[in-house]
Amino acid sequence: MTTHTHHGSCHCGAVKFTVETPVTPAVRCNCSLCRRKGALMSPFFPAGALNIVSGEDSLTLYQFNTQVAKHYFCKQCGIYPFHQTRKDPNLWRVNIGCLDDVDPYALESSVADGKSLSVVEDA
């Protein structure tokens, strides 16, 4: 896995960030939230690899189920740019579709079985 510094943003540009991460192997998760948001996610990366350049005050937090994972969304446009994982709160993933220099449709992906991690009924 080759790590690059990527620039990214939400759709409206209120949230801008840089992240040092490889983009492959890309992953889709089958949990109830990820199924609905449909994002293609980067491999895990450490929290220190993410830098919010602007718009931290434009982010809103959504948590469900065990309340461990932290899913961030732009308050203005609703786009999900990144999340802190449930598996390890020191690890994050970024929505590859938010990266300026990457075509998410050109990447192959695997499926992460987030559905089996659920401890409550599917929403």
Predicted segments, located by residue:
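A short Gly-Trp-Pro
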Residues: 1-9, 14-123
